[in-house]
């Protein structure tokens, strides 16, 4: 975008955001319901925008702590997808980075905090990508569901 008065060029680069597939020892995924717009009431993964000076890994830890009260001990990068996040009348272009955070600990006491209305566990066969709020998350969910290496066989 070029300023017609001074000629300054502003490049519209995407804002980095993170989301986590939190997987318990039964290979269930933690799913959240959005408490606020955009897409209030729709399904989501815990996550959010990175802050200035923060790595994406630090953002994952911070967002999980804020939204579900849990800090992962390990995480693995899975994939990324571009997205358009409509907020306050503006289209915010994002690059959403997805991580897998597995845990063998008891996670039955996780509760929704911050901008999460509720959180609950779903087994692989219960997950429906089309019920998630954003296209990038639907694509990441679909990719995870199709890759058997992430799922424990019964």
Language-model features, listed with the residues they occupy:
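Charged phosphate-binding loop/patch that engages nucleotide di/tri-phosphates or the phosphate backbone
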Residues: 138-154
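NUDIX/MutT-family hydrolases
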Residues: 110-140
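Active-site-adjacent beta-strand/loop module that shapes the phosphate/pyrophosphate-binding cleft
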Residues: 79-108
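Acidic, metal-coordinating catalytic segment for phosphate/diphosphate chemistry
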Residues: 1-20
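A generic structural micro-feature
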Residues: 12-14, 42, 89-95, 111-116
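Conserved Nudix-box catalytic region and its N-terminal flanking loop in Nudix hydrolases
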Residues: 24-66
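A short coil-to-beta-strand element that immediately follows conserved catalytic motifs
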Residues: 70-80
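Conserved hydrophobic "DFG−1" position in protein kinase catalytic cores
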Residues: 22-23, 31, 101, 121
């Amino acid at each position: 975008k070029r300023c017609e008065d001074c000629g300054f060029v502003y490049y519209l680069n995407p804002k980095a955001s993170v989301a986590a597939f939190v997987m318990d020892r039964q290979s269930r995924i933690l799913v959240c319901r959005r408490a606020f717009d955009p897409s209030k009431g729709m399904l989501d993964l815990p996550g959010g925008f990175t802050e200035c000076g923060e790595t994406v890994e630090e953002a994952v830890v911070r967002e999980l702590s804020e939204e579900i009260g849990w800090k992962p001990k390990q995480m693995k990068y899975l994939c990324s997808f571009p997205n358009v996040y409509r907020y306050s009348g503006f289209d915010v272009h994002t690059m959403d980075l997805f991580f897998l955070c597995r845990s063998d600990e008891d996670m039955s006491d996780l509760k929704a905090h911050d901008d999460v209305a509720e959180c609950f566990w779903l087994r692989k066969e219960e997950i429906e990508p089309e019920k998630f709020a954003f296209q990038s998350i639907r694509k990441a969910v679909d990719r995870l569901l199709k890759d058997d290496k992430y799922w424990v066989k019964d």
